[in-house]
Design a protein with these regions (language model features):
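Active-site-proximal or metal-binding-adjacent scaffold patches in catalytic folds
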Residues: 1-175
Length: 175
């Protein structure tokens, strides 16, 4: 559905009694509405809430699609870093000040994969450091620790197994 001044809004119909507006990643706007709600009523609702939608869109950053090329800027631990990609004898990734040096063995090797594995290892070391500090204080000791890509949360825990799972995106935050 197109709303003047806002743009395209995705309408999701569910078995609910009220309408909800959400601005998601990449500045994607959608409204969840009752199945019985008419298009006209949804359009009026969105028009009434237009100021809120525009204010929220202004605060929401655009989705960043990285290409993992030489000279590209990324966020690492809350600071901008520059990728420097070069060929070499083995796949490696190192941090040198504000520069991330990525060495790729062959052209078929994915720079993204090397960078993500390195980021995952770095985040694991940071998380383990914090867990050691707080586990003793709280008297609770976790089982397994995993790092994975998560869209909707920063982490989770499994009470039965003691597993702690953290979002890979935490590596972009200032710790």
């Amino acid at each position: 559905m197109y709303i003047e001044g806002v743009g395209e809004v995705e309408v999701i119909r569910k078995r609910i009694s009220r309408m909800y507006i959400h601005v998601g990643r990449g500045r994607h706007v959608f409204v969840t509405a009752p199945r019985t709600c008419s298009e006209d009523l949804i359009r009026r609702f969105l028009t009434e809430k237009k100021d809120w939608i525009l204010a929220t869109l202004e605060k929401t950053p655009e989705a960043v699609e990285y290409e993992y090329t030489d000279g590209e800027e990324h966020i690492l631990l809350g600071k901008k870093v520059t990728l420097h990609v070069a060929g070499g004898a083995s796949n490696a990734c190192t941090l040198n000040g504000r520069d991330v040096m990525i060495t790729v063995r062959s052209s078929r090797t994915s720079v993204r994969k090397i960078y993500e594995e390195w980021s995952r290892d770095m985040l694991r070391r940071i998380v383990v450091m914090y867990i050691k500090k707080w586990a003793e204080t709280m008297g609770v000791f976790p089982g397994d620790i995993t790092i994975r890509k998560m869209k909707g949360r920063w982490g989770s825990c499994n009470v039965k197994t003691g597993e702690l799972c953290f979002a890979l995106d935490l590596i972009t935050k200032d710790g």
